Amino acid sequence: MASSPGNTNPHNTPPFDLGILFKPSSNPYPPPAASYPPPTGPFLHNQYDQQHYAPPGISAQPSPVTQQQQDVSSSSAATNLHPQRTLSYPTPPLNLQSPRSNHNPGTHILALLNNTNNGAPVANQEPSHQLPVVNHNEIARSFPGGSGPIRVPSCKLPKGRRLIGEHAVYDVDVRLQGEIQPQLEVTPITKYGSDPQLVVGRQIAVNKVYICYGLKGGNIRVLNINTALRSLFRGHSQRVTDMAFFAEDVDMLASVSLDGKVFVWKISEGSEGEDQPQITGKIVLALQILGEEDTKHPRVCWHCHKQEILVVSIGKHVLRIDTTKVGRGEVFSAEAPLQCPLDKLIDGVQIVGKHDGEVTDLSMCQWMTTRLVSSSVDGTIKIWQDRKAQPLVVLRPHDGHPVSSATFVTSPERPDHIILITGGPLNREMKIWVSAGEEGWLLPADAESWRCTQTLDLKSSTEPRAEEAFFNQVIALSEAGLLLLANAKRNALYAVHLDYGSSPVGTRMDYLSEFTVTMPILSFIGTNDPPEEPIVKVYCVQTLAIQQYTLDLCLCLPPPIENMGLEKSDSSVSREANLVEGMSEPSGLKPTDLPSVDSVPKPSIIVNRSESANKLSFPSAEATSQAIVPPNGEPKTSGLPSQTSGAGSAYATLPQLPLSPRLSSKLSGYHTPVEAIEPVIPHHELGGKTPSADYSVDRQMDAVGERNLDVSSVEEISRSKDSNVTPDDDVSGMRSPSAFFKHPTHLVTPSEILMGVSSAEASITTEDRRDRDANIQDVNNDPRDTEVEVKEISEARSTQNGEINDHDETENCTSENREKVFCSQVSNLSTEMARDCYPSTEGTFIPGESKAYGQPIKAGDESGVDSRGGPAKLLKGKKQKAKNSQGPGLSSTSSNVANLADSFNEQSQSLSHPMTDLLPQLLAMQETMNQVMASQKEMQRQLSNAATGPIGKESKRLEVALGRMIEKSSKSNADALWARIQEETVKNEKALRDHAQQIVNATTNFMSKELNAMFEKTIKKELAAIGPALARSVVPVIEKTVSSAITESFQRGIGDKAVNQLDKSVNIKLEATVARQIQAQFQTSGKQALQEGLRSSVESSVIPSFEKACKAMFDQIDSAFQKGIAEHTNAAQQRFDSGHSQLAHTLKESITSASSVAQALSRELAETQRNLLALAAAGANSGGSNSLVTQLSGGPLGALLEKVEAPMDPTTELSRLISERKYEESFTSALQRSDVSIVSWLCSQVDLRGLLAMNPLPLSQGVLLSLLQQLACDISKDTSRKLAWMTDVVAAINPSDQMIAVHARPIFEQVYQILHHHRNAPGSDVSAIRLIMHVINSMLMGCK
């Protein structure tokens, strides 16, 4: 099936050919051909009966144990004999599966479906197929709700391959020596006739209660894991491409389909009257995105902490949907969802960004919830931030080829340990990306850069085209540290282990394990539920069924450090040391009398948490093999050379290998190979009660890990006389420690940001053994303790508990050698590793557990006395050895246990000794019990001394880490603040220079151009007005003077002389008079009129305009400068004060928390000592244990947990901030909670009107705008008070402020619409509403 390079899904998908998916691969170990459902015979035998395994050479012959059981009990032969399945590949080493408790949801739901679906028709959307039913004659064990399900365990141990270097290549067709690809343990859930299509996306979603998967027509099937109730959700009209639950404990399901429909379902159960409960799905959101026609795989992604926010990709667009705003007040319908075109988005839907090609995957960062990554077929991934139209980062991770997946992965140890994993075409090439900053830590910034640290390339050497060999689906399980890839073309599942390291840049893919499945996986999802078991449950949509595979985490981890030296230097294959345990064979033991092996406990898990180096370590998954006797009767063993002790037991020891300095600071662990060869007490002998498996927890302060030891009950010797007992009465099981990967969804607090360590976890597990047994209480220590090497002390348990390992047929007991290897490493120290190897004999006594039992031995137990030797004499010798070896350390207790176990092994080889010979043994047992108690007291004293050092060391480490972090944060904040101040100062200086230059240019232009023209125009106008006035004043005077002069001249003389002089006289007088009059008139009236005209013209036109222009210009410059400087100074001061006050407060809280934890640990340690002393004094009194359980349950640790888990009242913190006059911080904290009741309470605690009247304002414009919006959203409650507050707030808002310029208009419009809906309020409120609406309208007009 070819796939175009521009799309991860095939174009124009033809009818799917199942032959392609089931095409045999070139795997040298092909999976067995199996039809659905898988054969049940051999695997049910492995799961629920005592295991009888035939080696490869004699697989077709009945085993000796089977023959023996046929002779002993013919009634149980039909139960125990199952034909071994013939495999088409070499039989792997023995893999003994331990029986699990019924935590498997697939097991439970299948059993319930078998009862609820008998004879009931199935809806036409889901093909009707009968689920496999198990015959009750084959399984004598009862299950709740009906017959047991089919659970097919894995038949061989995996052997993976190490991934070394920055570019690792894994060829799926090449098998190195020793590599094994087993089939996974599978539990069918339901038969399913799917429409096989190879497309990306999650077609199945699982949480703690429900399993949801899509059907052909777009409907969604919902199954209750616990009750097997079923329901069908209808709404999608085409295939569902993606679905996801908000969280594992929240029943909110989001789904999206090809037709662009987005649904959010709130799943609930209820019943009407006495009817059977029904599953119902309330539609929280029904939306159809229009505008993208050719969409292949829409995706959906929840916000990490907000149930009302989800992100959806439709075609090339990435949308953010707020379910509280979309269709507010409307009732959604599945038949008619709300329409939302991309070119005209409705309220509550906004576009985050867009790609050039279709979006293939979405992922949101849990730590920094403003970061969202999207991948596309255009070859890019883009990292988006809230409220920014452009992406922060655009990467082309796979050289421009389509990107099929992009996922943020967060370390479970540190929430700020973030990496990005991308997948190329067909998810064949996987890359790890980290931030390019120091050590890869992701810090808030406006621009980012990422770099690739490692690449994993999957290739096929037999297929020339990658499309014919690969189509991988990818999921990342951050808590388990796994990256799972399901290859539908090869029926394979690849588990890639992630080693997080001490920093993001140190994260590596270091190990790859391959598993085979029976049919192609079309889509899958993984969970860590139940948290008690170190397993991952993978729920798969396959071509013929919905199935659940169980993946043991210990099978996906690289070998421990001890086995590093066994690897070849020229290959990447990891080789583990085989631990071989020999069996002591007394003279009376026949080769055909080998005891049957019921189960081998899976290796336990150590979780070591440290701030400097986060480690997740697992012991190696090593199967301890017995000596297998071939037909010729010669026992053979394989493995390392063994040394034979004096008793004839062979102990396999690990070679002392050099440790890798590079790995010494990252991995620490131990492994405990155990053979469980103990029969168990029949069910009817326990008084009708089902016994729960005993286990003990070894506390180790350096790794703070937990180890499970499967402690089975012992079958009494008289069992052979009871014909009603069958081997199927075995109901023992193994229980795992408390959850390792349980991380519920939570909101990140500032202290978590600074400290980077998770809160303390403690759990108390009690287990009721039998009516007369004492209760055992195991308390898990705080996983953050520092590493201190503490010796393990093995304690002996009294054999009066009826736990003597006898076999009623062989008359002997096989002693078992246990080797414990304890490796301890201190963080950041890679120079040395301490090993403590010691052998101990495991028989009746269980390390780490002490029980007192006062019930006398029954008469039927007399057969346990050895007739071939003097028991009193042997006991005396053992007693003397126990006295000589008694001491406060590890060797004394282990030797006591070994000697006592040897004595019982020797005594149990005879069945004819009288009862009276057991009395010395009882006395010796009592004395040994006292020695064990003394050793216990010494161990407690050593633990007390060892606990003080770790607490002090942890306090110092915490202090140093906090100091470094605070110093680094303060320095970065100060540098950023100083850089911002300098930048703003430079900007202001540049603006001032620009304004001054503009003023100079304007003044120059005015003086050179406009002033001359205006002055000339004014002069001309005034002269034109002065001329007529001057003529009117001068002409009458001239006329009068001329007439008077003429008259005078005529009067003086007549004649020639008079006439001659008349002309001269008239001219002289006329000139003098005219000149004098003109001068006088001009000096008096003309000059004054000219000056007044000029002055009035200049004053009326030139000077006012010039003064007005200059004043306006200078006022604008001054106001802008003063405002900018004031706002910048206030913002810088507030940011500086808030940053330092927050750091100081966080530091104070961190120190207080650390002190309280240290005090609680000290008190708990003292209480533990007192309780253990009380237990020793109580002896065989079972009532004392009950009181101890009561004391421990109500002890200081429980009170501390209740104190830690109690939620903090936000009003207390807000009151403190108000008392300190930190109004900005208090309002910001209240508004960020998105709780209007808290905001209203805060407004009522302060004088908001007086606060807003201060100068400068103590609240920033952003806080005021947010306060206005939140008060408006809850205006229906306490309307009058909120309107008064809104009136004061809206009067203080400056819409031209650059801080809120982008957000002011949409928020004003929203508030205006809310007030518009409340216009019909009472009369006293109408005026306030209109006033606020008028002010908002004015601001909106000013914002245009």
UniProtKB/Swiss-Prot annotation:
Keyword Repeat set for record: yes
Coiled coil: 925-946, 1147-1178
Any one GO biological process: post-embryonic development
Organism this protein belongs to: Arabidopsis thaliana
Region of interest (Disordered), residue spans: 1-88, 616-649, 711-735, 762-815, 845-896
Cell compartments where the protein resides: Cytoplasm, P-body
Listed InterPro entries: EDC4-like (IPR045152), EDC4_C (IPR049404), EDC4_C_sf (IPR044938), EDC4_WD40 (IPR032401), WD40/YVTN_repeat-like_dom_sf (IPR015943), WD40_repeat_dom_sf (IPR036322), WD40_rpt (IPR001680)
Modification type Phosphothreonine: residues: 86
Repeat found in the keyword field: yes
Entry comment describing in which tissues the protein is expressed: Present in seedlings, roots, hypocotyls, cotyledons, leaves, stems, shoot apex, siliques and flowers. In leaves, particularly present in trichomes, some stomata and vascular tissues.
WD repeat copies, ranges: 235-275, 354-394, 397-443
Induction info: By auxin.
Primary location recorded for the protein, binned into one broad class: cytoplasm
Sites of Phosphoserine modification: 98, 660, 692
Protein name: Enhancer of mRNA-decapping protein 4
Disruption phenotype: Lethal phenotype at the seedling cotyledon stage that are small and chlorotic, with disorganized veins, swollen root hairs, and altered epidermal cell morphology as well as leaf and shoot apical meristem defects. Altered RNA decay. These phenotypes are suppressed at low temperature.
Residue spans of biased composition, Basic and acidic residues class: 766-795
This protein's GO CC annotations: P-body
Keyword line: Coiled coil, Cytoplasm, mRNA processing, Phosphoprotein, Repeat, WD repeat
Compositionally biased region (Polar residues): 1-11, 616-627, 884-896
Annotated function: As a component of the decapping complex, involved in the degradation of mRNAs. Essential for postembryonic development, especially during the formation of the shoot (SAM) and root apical meristems. Required for normal patterning of internal tissues of leaves.
Record field: transmembrane: none
Segments forming domain LEM: 1186-1230
Pfam families: EDC4_C (PF21289), Ge1_WD40 (PF16529)
Annotated Pro residues bias: 27-41
Record's subunit section: Homodimer. Component of the decapping complex. Interacts with DCP2.
Cross-referenced Gene3D superfamilies: conserved c-terminal region of ge- 1, YVTN repeat-like/Quinoprotein amine dehydrogenase
